[in-house]
Amino acid sequence: MPRYEPQEIESKWQKFWEKEGLFKTPQHSDLPKYYMLVMFPYPSGTLHVGHVKNYVIGDAVARYKRMRAYNVLHPFGYDAFGLPAENAAIERKIHPKDWTLNNINIIRRQIKKLGISYDWNREVITCLESYYKWTEWIFLKLYEAGLAYKKKAAVNWCPKCMTSLANEQVKDGRCERCDTPVTIKHLEQWFFKITDYAERLLKDLDKLTGWPEHVKTMQRNWIGESKGAKISFKVEESEMNIEVFTTRPDTLWGVTFMVLAPESDLVNHITLPELKGELEKFLNYVGQQDRHKRGSADVEKEGFFTGRYAINPVSGERIPIYVANYVLMEYGTGAVMGVPAHDQRDYEFAVKYNLPIKEVIKPSEDIPKNRAYDGPGIMVNSGPLNGTVVPEGIERVIQWLEERGIAKRSVQYKLRDWLISRQRYWGAPIPIVYCEKCGMVPVPEKSLPVQLPYDVEFLPTGQSPLMLNDEFRKTSCPKCGGPALRDADTMDTFVDSSWYFLRYVNPDRDDVPFVKEDVDHWLPVDQYVGGVEHAVLHLLYSRFITKVLYDLGYLSFDEPFENLFTQGMIYKDGAKMSKSKGNVVSPDEMIDRYGADTLRMYILFMGPPERDAEWNDAGIEGVYRFIRRAWSLMDQIISLPDNQNQVFAEEEKHLRRKLHISLRKVTQDMEGGFKFNTVVSSLMELVNDAYDYIDNLPQHRWNIKLLKELAKNFVLMISPFAPHFAEELWQRMGYSSSVMKEKWPEYDPDALVVEEVEIAIQVNGKLRDKVKIPVDATEDQIKEIALKSEKVRKYISDEPKKIIYVPKRLLNIIF
């Protein structure tokens, strides 16, 4: 057999797989289904080996499951709309569509060179009309259900990307895409009412037993459930009431002021007319502050007195109403009751503005005098509830307030509605028109898709580029036929990715986004693989859209992903791979040098796949040496003539035991989780064991039948990880079918039985000999064997005082 030439072998088998259609998944089968999905990429450039990691992981699982007799759905596509592709296109002065589709061609070629077993007949590209027609359809379904609405709102604005951002796309006050500090703009924007699903999104996390706990914790924290009470404060000399949400109703007797968020609609209504001019200056001043820093504990507290007072509903005391920078609309109702004795931010505000500080919880410990106390204690200065223990007494306080109509029990969430409007070109159009006569009108389903025009000046200006395109904008009203204008914003790309896993089931249907019977068969996804950075964005939005479609009757399941695996990153020189850092490792270069199978196996061998790993050139060289060594071993075995050796000598029994131990271990590691590194290690050990056998025996004593058994099972086991290598060897062994169509091998329990064991013989605790004994030997038989040993007898003088036997390990003779 010629030497290992990966480029020739891999090209040969990739053509074979494509010609035979081996990756194509039948829609219906008698086999159980298995939906294996990796998160699809943004095609904003070529792939590096960091991107490749999850594709290799997914393919190992898909190939293994096929061999375990599953009908495996393993599709691929491209998250082709959005800022990354658009910004890259702008930098290169090329149209986003041309840039994106060219990149898709490159990425597709890269992935095919890796031998990933995707069903390319199911490929989806979100920027094509055949896909975004149904993204628009989903928008209409939410609109019809009252879950899509438009309002003027203070939104996160990235001055570099020139577009609004959802809260989830802002990290530490900066745009997650370009790291630019985010500002605030007031714009008419479209929102999806994800807050209506906050409780279900939170509670149903408990159903996701196949998800990593840290991902569920991230979602729980983002949804941010708070249990407490809503309390109504009457505004003095007014019909107005201010509703406040608090998790500490037990501190109500300690309220000495009230604070409104600057963005609250109440501010203008409550402020005295003669103070409106000063108010406007204050609001403009606060508007220049970083809203995300405003919410931090260490921000300097600044306020403006509205001139009005509210009435404390339990004490009847007048409390001044302020507007303050440290209160945000994102929390509760945008109004906060100031309890300076028991909230540090309120304390700092009260000290600055000389407001009363009234203790109503007696601390259970000594505290500094210049700090608020927010721990447990006993209620004091609290009227009829004096002496109530906190926090146990909070429930009693709520009941007392409810009985008197002062408060009502409430659950609030930190989660805010999903802002989906983008003032950019490269996204799915929003299917809404505006008619002077009929107002806001949805585009009829039969008129979809609203096509994104090609000839557009798409450089970001802060205004939606489609606003300037009359050919796109000007249309007729679907209701009255009169002149109308299309909505000029496009949808957030996370809308596209919130349902793509459904489209893979019926990608060619142009009359429906998916067939219910088919998605109900294939979904939920059995195994989803992707980065943890999507825990709060894509994964949360996908769960929301799935629940909406379930409620509307389009799906029979309400969670999209049954099991989730989050892979670690691959670093180079201690940093995440990026072109700007010059530390990118190209998969094409690695494939040209070592072959795709070596690259695949090295990625899987780098360590536990959920952890980050450092790329090491010596590491891939080591895996390349292993594959060539395994190739040479298989070459020797394949060239041997068949024989019918039936009786196994001790050497054969040992090697056969090693083979079936490997089979059991590899199977357990594949079934028990993503332990690919230990799988590869087991395969390496098996090759070493085989070489130990053939190197220590003359060839005429080799048990050829055993070696052929080892070679066959080795090739089957390695095939999910090095599929081209396995196919070539399988063919050279004389098999006519693809190794992909073979069943996963089963280990032989009888081969694992150890007939003899070696035990240590000690005299007074010192090792004197090692002897082999039958595995079923009795203790007396073992003592007899030990006492007959020449190495032991020279240390024996008379009858032993004591003999200690540790079964199957050692015998200690004590004199």
UniProtKB/Swiss-Prot annotation:
SUPFAM superfamilies found in the cross-reference section: Anticodon-binding domain of a subclass of class I aminoacyl-tRNA synthetases, Nucleotidylyl transferase, ValRS/IleRS/LeuRS editing domain
Enzyme Commission number(s): 6.1.1.4
Record's keyword annotation contains Nucleotide-binding: yes
Signal peptide: none
Pfam (any one): tRNA-synt_1
Chain positions of motif 'KMSKS' region: 576-580
Enzyme class, first EC level, given as a word: ligase
Catalytic activity: tRNA(Leu) + L-leucine + ATP = L-leucyl-tRNA(Leu) + AMP + diphosphate
Segments carrying motif 'HIGH' region: 41-51
Keywords, ordered alphabetically: Aminoacyl-tRNA synthetase, ATP-binding, Cytoplasm, Ligase, Nucleotide-binding, Protein biosynthesis
Binding site for ATP: 579
Gene Ontology BP, a term: leucyl-tRNA aminoacylation
GO molecular function: aminoacyl-tRNA deacylase activity; ATP binding; leucine-tRNA ligase activity
A cellular component term, taken from the record's GO annotations: cytosol
Similarity section: Belongs to the class-I aminoacyl-tRNA synthetase family.
HAMAP family (UniProt xref): Leu_tRNA_synth_B
Protein name: Leucine--tRNA ligase
Species of the source: Pseudothermotoga lettingae (strain ATCC BAA-301 / DSM 14385 / NBRC 107922 / TMO)
